[in-house]
Each structure stands twice: as C-alpha cells, then as structure tokens.
Amino acid sequence: MTQEKKDFTIHALPVLKDNIIWIWEASGQAVVVDPAVSEPVKEFLSQNNLALNSVLQTHHHDDHIGGTRDLISNWPSASIIACKTDLERIPFQTHSVTDQEVFTLFGYSVKVLEVPGHTRGHVAYYLSDTNADNRNPALFCGDTLFAGGCGRLFEGTPHEMFKSLKLLNSLPSNTKIYCAHEYTESNLHWANHLYPEDLLIKKRLEYVSSQRANGLLSLPSTIAEERKTNLFFRARTLEQFSQFRKHKDNWMS
C-alpha cells in the first residue's frame, strides 16, 4: 500500500563547534539525521510538538551518533536506520540498510547510497521522488561531501572516495545537499588559495563569508553549485583528486 506523501520541512540545528543536525519534519513527526548530541534535539522537538519517528545515521563517528542512545530512551519506538556493515559500531540500529536499498519515510522513497572513503561503512540517504511536489531532491550525505569540500580519509582510500564523489556528482543538478558540518568558508578559502583567479570560487567565497559574518548558515548547497566550485567534484582523475586531498590535509588557513 502506497503511503500518502506528507508536506515537509527540513530544519538545520547547529550544535557543537560546526556540526549540523538536520531535522526533517512532517505531520507532527521528525526524522533526525546524525544527532551528535541529544539535548538540543529534544528541546527542538518539544518546542515544536514533534515526536521522533526515525534517526538516519550516515556513519559511526561519535559526533554523529553521540546523542542517539538518549533519544532512544525518550522515544523507544523510533526507528534507527544505519548501514548493515556498521552494525558492530552502531549496535543500536533497528533497521540495517544496504547499498541501493529503498525505504519510505513520510510517503517519500529514500534510497541508500554506499559512499565509503571517510569511513568504510558510510552511507548517504537520497530523497528523489519530490518532483511532483515541486521540491528539490535532497541528499543527506554526512561527511562524504561538504559544501566546497569532502571528508578526510580516515578509513577509506582515495579511490573509494573518488568513486563515491563521482556517484554523488551523477545526481540531478538541483539536488539539495544537507551535509553534516559547516566547513564551507574554510573549504573555499583553500580553493581560492589554489585558484585565486577562479571567479566562481571567489564569488562564492565572498557570499559565504558574508553569510557567516551575519550568523547565517551556508547550507544546504546543491549539486550544481558543487560542480562549479568544489575542487574535489571538479577533479577529473584519481591522481588529481589525491593531490587535492593531500594538499587540503596539510593546508593551514
């Protein structure tokens, strides 16, 4: 039986130094993406009279799962969705998912995309069937793709991350990118350092710097924007990607 699609809103909840917890709200319920901590989430849900429906976990790092156990204690019936290969590192998951698996939330299809590189068991969640509602597709991508950057390679290889980014780069250009950290300004400073004559990077850096100076987020981004100004997205070869990643790892702004 097909679930009726529900009107929804995606909220940004900044926590810690630069984490963003995304809260997908519909009809008095919420899906929380990568809850680094629990108290701000509980406060937001309480203030907005929302019940926790599900938690989407992109990977096992503590600044993404640190608040989940406490949320479970408050909403024990909530679904905890995470990658099956990370079951040992995210043992409280109730729904273990695999690459290309599709499940439904709020009447919308959500596709699981395995995107290793930052960690071995990293996944992204792609909400695609929104066109009939005049909405952009949405991608919750954790620490794989950032606005202007990508995640460090803590467990994966350059080849794995390059392949993961190529997969995300193949998504529709109007896809909104809901990544898990506000790193955009730093990423663009690095890109501008390498390519000071690139007007697209320079213009975006000016805009993002203005946003941040006024206390505003630079997120979400879009696939189209990343194709223009994200050097990791623009890398044509594995060698070029690897050079960018090595340079970024050792760069000090």
Swiss-Prot record:
Binding residues for Zn(2+) 1: 59, 61, 118, 143
Cross-referenced SMART domains: Lactamase_B
The UniProt record lists the keyword Metal-binding: yes
InterPro entries xref list: Clx_II_MBL, Glyoxalase_II_hydrolase, HAGH_C, Hydroxyacylglutathione_Hdrlase, Metallo-B-lactamas, RibonucZ/Hydroxyglut_hydro
Domain of life of the organism encoding this protein: Bacteria
EC number(s) given by UniProt: 3.1.2.6
Molecular function GO terms recorded: hydroxyacylglutathione hydrolase activity; metal ion binding
Pathway info: Secondary metabolite metabolism; methylglyoxal degradation; (R)-lactate from methylglyoxal: step 2/2
Catalytic activity: an S-(2-hydroxyacyl)glutathione + H2O = a 2-hydroxy carboxylate + glutathione + H(+)
UniProt keyword terms in alphabetical order: Hydrolase, Metal-binding, Zinc
Cofactor comment text: Binds 2 Zn(2+) ions per subunit.
Binding-site list for Zn(2+) 2: 63-64, 143, 181
SUPFAM superfamilies noted in UniProt: Metallo-hydrolase/oxidoreductase
Pfam families named among the record's database cross-references: HAGH_C, Lactamase_B
Hydrolase as UniProt keyword: yes
Any single biological process term in GO: methylglyoxal catabolic process to D-lactate via S-lactoyl-glutathione
Family the UniProt entry places it in: Belongs to the metallo-beta-lactamase superfamily. Glyoxalase II family.
Subunit structure: Monomer.
Protein function: Thiolesterase that catalyzes the hydrolysis of S-D-lactoyl-glutathione to form glutathione and D-lactic acid.
Protein name in UniProt: Hydroxyacylglutathione hydrolase
Organism: Prochlorococcus marinus (strain MIT 9211)
